[in-house]
């Protein structure tokens, strides 16, 4: 079943981080990890796992938080003060919870981050896995992820109608919860699948249509693809802002966009050499970041210090 589309409510998405990730989910995470910390030298968690950060801090274990939001705009520490204070009190931790850990690993290029929400001073920039080298051709990949795919109304149908009109080879990944057969017969140049090897497919694609998840954003850049984004929730509207502001493609309203508008956007963005140049420049910037092994060496310093103190 696919739920109807609703307009993006940015305030709601921000409040989910505050009420859920820094609230109920953090309480549960802290409770589950606390018993595992004896003898630990370092805790590595994603930037939304405030419970792991709090439990580690309470136990005196250094924390490396890993950014998972490319734009940096979804997680706003100034909105988390009350929730993190409740978490601190519950754990009996004397000092305020540090919502960025001791080190903050960022596997995205600095330009991908919204300048209104800069990385903290303890940031370690890290190159993501490069994936296959781009060999772009007239080929389109479309996906709406594995959560918002079932909250997308008739957006898949509109995308498929647009791809039929464009006429170049395309693959649409609908996710594990949807049967490709529900979308009916498609032209021979359009393939509908539950799963695809995204890295392999993105390295071929000159255009990627997606929902705006941070992972698809960075993987599309590394694949050398222009992007058309249909933001529906979570961090997606902020990712869409970066795609637009960096000139990497177009942002379309998932609620109102027509098949003709989608097709026109595909043909326009693939013909724009300026977009291709910006994508390639950002790809080079991303690949020039410090390697994971370099970052791991930096992470070992606080871990070794903690081990000596035990």
Residue ranges and their predicted role:
Residues 1-20:
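Conserved nucleotide-sugar phosphate-binding/catalytic loop shared by glycosyltransferases and other
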Residues 118-121, 125-207:
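Donor-nucleotide binding loops and adjacent catalytic segments primarily
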Residues 41-42, 103, 139, 207:
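Structural motif
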Residues 22-91:
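Conserved nucleotide-sugar donor-interacting segment of glycosyltransferase catalytic cores
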Residues 47-51, 109-113, 131, 174-180:
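Short, polar loop motifs at secondary-structure junctions
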Residues 59-62, 168, 225:
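A short helix->loop->beta-strand "cap" motif at the edges of active sites that frequently abuts
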Residues 66, 73-82, 86, 94-95, ...:
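Nucleotide-activated sugar donor-binding and catalytic core shared by glycosyltransferases
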């Amino acid at each position: 079943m696919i739920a109807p589309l609703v307009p993006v409510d940015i305030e709601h998405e921000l409040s989910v981080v505050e009420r859920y990730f820094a609230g109920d989910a953090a309480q549960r995470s802290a409770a589950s990890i606390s018993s595992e910390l004896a003898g630990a030298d370092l805790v590595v968690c994603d930037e939304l796992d405030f419970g792991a950060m709090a439990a580690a801090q309470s136990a005196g274990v250094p924390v490396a938080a890993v950014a998972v939001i490319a734009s940096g705009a979804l997680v706003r520490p100034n909105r988390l003060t009350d929730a993190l204070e409740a978490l601190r009190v519950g754990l009996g931790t004397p000092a305020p919870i540090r919502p960025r850990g001791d080190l903050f690993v960022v596997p995205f290029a600095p330009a991908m981050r919204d300048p209104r929400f800069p990385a903290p001073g303890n940031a370690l920039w890290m190159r993501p896995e490069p994936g296959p080298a781009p060999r772009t051709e007239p080929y389109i990949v479309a996906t709406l992820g594995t959560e918002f795919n079932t909250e997308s109304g008739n957006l898949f149908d509109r995308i498929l109608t647009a791809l039929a009109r464009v006429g170049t080879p395309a693959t649409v990944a609908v996710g594990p919860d949807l049967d490709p057969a529900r979308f009916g017969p498609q032209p021979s140049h359009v393939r509908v699948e539950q799963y695809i090897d995204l890295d392999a497919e993105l390295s071929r694609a000159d255009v990627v249509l997606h929902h705006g998840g941070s992972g698809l954003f960075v993987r599309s850049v590394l694949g050398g693809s222009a992007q058309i984004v249909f933001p529906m929730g979570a961090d997606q509207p902020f990712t869409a802002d970066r795609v637009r502001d960096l000139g990497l493609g177009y942002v379309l309203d998932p609620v109102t966009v027509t098949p003709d508008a989608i097709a026109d956007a595909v043909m326009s963005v693939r013909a724009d050499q300026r977009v291709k140049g910006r994508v390639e420049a950002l790809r080079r910037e991303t690949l020039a970041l410090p390697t994971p092994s370099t970052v791991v060496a930096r992470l070992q310093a606080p871990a070794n210090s903690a081990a000596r103190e035990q």
